[in-house]
UniProtKB/Swiss-Prot annotation:
Family listed: Belongs to the ATPase C chain family.
Disulfide bonds: none
MF terms (GO), sorted A to Z: lipid binding; proton-transporting ATP synthase activity, rotational mechanism
Ranges annotated as spanning the membrane: 1-21, 47-67
Name of this protein: ATP synthase subunit c
Annotated positions for site Reversibly protonated during proton transport: E54
Signal sequence bounds: none
Length: 70
């Protein structure tokens, strides 16, 4: 049962992070197309947002390992 719980936790976190990253990147590209003069500022903000979104699956993997090995 622990294997199933760990797999579900990691899988849902990976799915949610990939969906969130896709939305952030698509909206950033859309904004860059509308206002090219802000592309540098938008790009740096996008990288910060993607980094924060990627923290969730990393924490989920840690929780999955705790579920598996405890």
């Amino acid at each position: 049962m622990n294997f199933l719980a760990a797999a579900i936790a990691a899988g849902l976190a990976a799915f949610a992070a990939s969906y969130g990253n896709g939305k952030v990147i698509s909206k950033t590209i859309e904004s860059m197309a509308r206002q090219p003069e802000l592309s540098a500022q938008l790009r740096s903000t996008m990288f910060i947002g993607v980094g924060l979104i990627e923290a969730v699956p990393i924490l989920s993997i840690v929780v999955s390992f705790l579920i598996l090995f405890s």
